[in-house]
Amino acid sequence: PIIANVTGGVSGPAVLPIGLAAVYHTRTVLPDIPIIGLGGIDSGEKALEYLYAGANAVEVGAAALFDPVAPLRVARELDDLLDSRPELAAKLAAGQTWR
């Protein structure tokens, strides 16, 4: 296939494990910087994985291309997950999940 910009990219679900590892390793080396987790987030559970790995915030990218309301759905799902697990919400608020 012909690729317009000569390089190809990887996005969506295939990036999730790479993104999670990058967030975790960055957090262990630089514990005080803000980190935005992105790559493969199409559900509240996957957003929670990034937060648990050490991200301060998450971004929904490719999923929004296929479903424009995906960011709102993911936020709602994440909110529901945290409401159902107050102990996890407290750990996230204290920055203790990735340790």
How should these model regions be labeled?
Residues L16, L72, R76-R99:
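Extended, intrinsically disordered, low-complexity segments
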Residues G40-I41, K46-V74:
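Glycine-rich phosphate-binding active-site loops on the catalytic face of alpha/beta enzymes
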Residues R27, I33-E45:
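Glycine-rich adenosine-cofactor-binding loop
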Residues S11-V15, I36-G40, A63:
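Glycine- and other small-residue-rich loops at beta-strand/loop junctions that grip anionic moieties
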Residues H25, V29, A53, R73, ...:
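Alpha-helical structural signal in soluble globular domains
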Residues P1-I33:
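Glycine/Thr-rich beta-alpha phosphate-binding loop at enzyme active sites
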Residues S11-Y24, E45, F66-E77:
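Active-site-adjacent beta->alpha loops and helix N-cap segments on the catalytic face
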Residues T26, Y50, A89:
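Conserved, mostly hydrophobic/aromatic
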